[in-house]
Amino acid sequence: MMQARYSVADPNALGVVPYLSEQNYYRAAGTYGSMATPMSVYPTHEQYTQGMGRSYGPYHHHQPTAPKDLVKPPYSYIALITMAIQNAPDKKITLNGIYQFIMDRFPFYRENKQGWQNSIRHNLSLNECFVKVPRDDKKPGKGSYWSLDPDSYNMFENGSFLRRRRRFKRKDVCREKEDRLLKDQGKAQGPISSLELPKHEKKIVIKSESPELPVITKVENLSPDGGSAMQDSPRSVASTPSVSTDNSIPDQHPASNGFSVENIMTLRTSPHGDLSPVPQVPCRTGMVPSLPINYTAQTQSSVYSQACTQSMDTSGSYQCTMRAMSLYAGDRPSHMCAPSSLEEATSEHHNGTSSPLTSMSLGSGQESVLTSSHHQQTATGGQTAAPWYLNPGADIGHLSGHNFGSQQQTFPNVREMFNSHRLGIESSALSEHQVSGNTNCQIPYRSAPSIYRHSSPYAYDCTKY
């Protein structure tokens, strides 16, 4: 049945169908005859093999094997031009020489005339790695020479023309050269600049901590000479420079004499009546007089303003009465009390007694600093108050009905004075022997409004209450 269907006369003719008509590679062998019976069991396979043999037969002549020389080389036009220039004896070549080199080396460009020469010309003119060299007169010919830029010899990776690192640009090359020069100069000047840098920093530090700088707004003493000045806690010492009569810039004076911790401790441990005078500290600004005040860090409740804590008389203290304070409540806008200097104080007093300027440090336990143990001395009655602690426009003599002499009155303590004045009772805390019949008193001296205003939260104004 199978043989009747396919009507194969010779079973050996199964493998005779040639793949190549000219060369019969699959010839019939004796072994193929024994395969006729088992292959007849698979009719589809037999039909497939016959159809495959027939289908591939007629198309073989239209697929000729292309020679290797006709394949396009895997090089760019820049690589081809570079090859031509580098193979030239003088490393320069004309345009026709580039054409000839490419056609001799690569036969693909010999037969393929599809505009590759135009591409060569474009690459020569557009790429900066190729430099046009004018032709010398000694060598006759046509066309200029083309050469490579000296900086473009390494534009291919490892000498391989298949890979180019990046597009060559002269701007990048110039920039790289400048960077190299800067790096070389930086390396050469590196040790010198490192040696000069500490000197410059040292100069800056010396200028910032120079003792010649005037300390106006700062509390800490930046001078290295003031070893005893308080630098740890700014609240412990509030310093305002006093004024010298001569406005001379001081040479390095140890400004910590009246502001040191030792002086504060001696004032606290000394008896209440013995108040040591503060030495005069010269200052650059000689405009507004002011007094140095020492505040301790513990004085929260018993610190008063300068007008009431600091006083002066011929023996060492000034006190103020309620009546005088009530008289001058509206005439004194400022709460700063400040004598200008010790020399003026001693020159204005005609009784010949010394008037030391005192500054007090009120501790937390000291509530009555000025006691009744202060000396009372009477002077001549017609002597008016010293004009150096008064305002120029508000002298005592201008007040009618009151004669202010130099008779001194003392109070039992400062706390009692302020309590009575705050309650508005003028005569409750004053005994009969404290206020004389002619109502003479020595009032607290006040100056013009100071430009250095005390920003301490512990200072109270006598005229407020």
Swiss-Prot record:
Biased composition (Basic and acidic residues): 174-186
Main location group: nucleus
Protein name: Forkhead box protein C2-A
SUPFAM superfamilies the record matches: Winged helix' DNA-binding domain (SSF46785)
Gene Ontology biological process: anatomical structure morphogenesis; cell differentiation; mesoderm development; positive regulation of DNA-templated transcription; positive regulation of transcription by RNA polymerase II; regulation of DNA-templated transcription; regulation of transcription by RNA polymerase II
DNA-binding region in chain numbering: 72-166
Tissues expressing the protein: After the mid-blastula transition, expressed in the dorsolateral mesoderm but not within the dorsal blastopore lip. During gastrulation and neurulation, expressed within the dorsal mesoderm and the lateral border of the neural plate but not within the dorsal midline. In neurula stage embryos, expressed throughout the entire somite-forming mesoderm, at the border between mesoderm and ectoderm but not within the notochord, neuroectoderm or lateral plate mesoderm.
GO cellular component: nucleus
Disulphide-bridged cysteine pairs: none
Pfam families: Forkhead
The UniProt record lists the keyword Ligase: no
Classification lineage: Eukaryota, Metazoa, Chordata, Craniata, Vertebrata
Organism domain of life: Eukaryota
Keyword Amino-acid biosynthesis carried by entry: no
Subcellular location: Nucleus
General function of this protein: Transcriptional activator. May be involved in the dorso-ventral patterning of the mesoderm.
Region (Disordered): 174-196, 219-258, 339-385
